[in-house]
Swiss-Prot record:
Mg(2+) binds at residues 37, 110, 113. Residues 153-223 form the DRBM domain. It catalyses: Endonucleolytic cleavage to 5'-phosphomonoester. The gene is rnc1. Its EC number is 3.1.26.3. InterPro entries: dsRBD_dom (IPR014720), RNase_III (IPR011907), RNase_III_dom (IPR000999), RNase_III_sf (IPR036389). Homodimer. This is Ribonuclease 3 1. GO terms for molecular function: double-stranded RNA binding; metal ion binding; ribonuclease III activity; rRNA binding. It comes from Nostoc sp. (strain PCC 7120 / SAG 25.82 / UTEX 2576).
Amino acid sequence: MYKLLMFRDDKLLRRALTHRSYVNENPEEGEHNERLEFLGDAILNFLSGEYLYRSHPDRGEDELTRRRSALVDEKQLAKFAIEVGLDFKMRLGKGAIRDGGYQNPNLLSSTFEAVIGAYYLDNNSNIEAVRAIIEPLFESVPEQIVVVRSNVDSKNRFQEWVQRNIGPTPPKYLTEQIGGFSHAPEFKATVLVGEKEYGEGIGKNKKDAEKAAAENALANLNKQELLP
């Protein structure tokens, strides 16, 4: 059995594996895992941030933020959940199982967070015990996957945020060449919504500059705690 599933308190592990849908169908089971999920999410954000801070001393805040998002996004946490054997151990309601819950990335990732939170409590709130489990998982993610995920669709992600929070008006990118050479120009892009500037970025072509501006806009929103 994977070490993450070795608990002193079996009831705590059972609660971490129990989804709300199971409790709805079995009220006598008591508490579901959402409070533990909240705790695990906070722990994973801290440990991933600390791990990246130590392992990438040459990276700036924006890139570290993007890399952390890639390490603890739903897709990656779901993979971790399967790797440690959580998938068919999840306690789901019949409807969730019928809808493919054991393969559902959202359920897998949230259960993984809950088990991390529970493991922390089971080890007397010792963060070192969790670090010993989670850092090898972080290290197992190929660098190329982290890079690709951290840079994927930043313009689309920002546009989706605008549509959800402001309205249908798409972001506008103002791009100009600011220097470089004819064979290696340098461009600067500024992204606006209406008349408000949200971010800016520099790149070797217009596309890269606009992507950097969108990434900067997302980083600014994250600082203001405006991203989900």
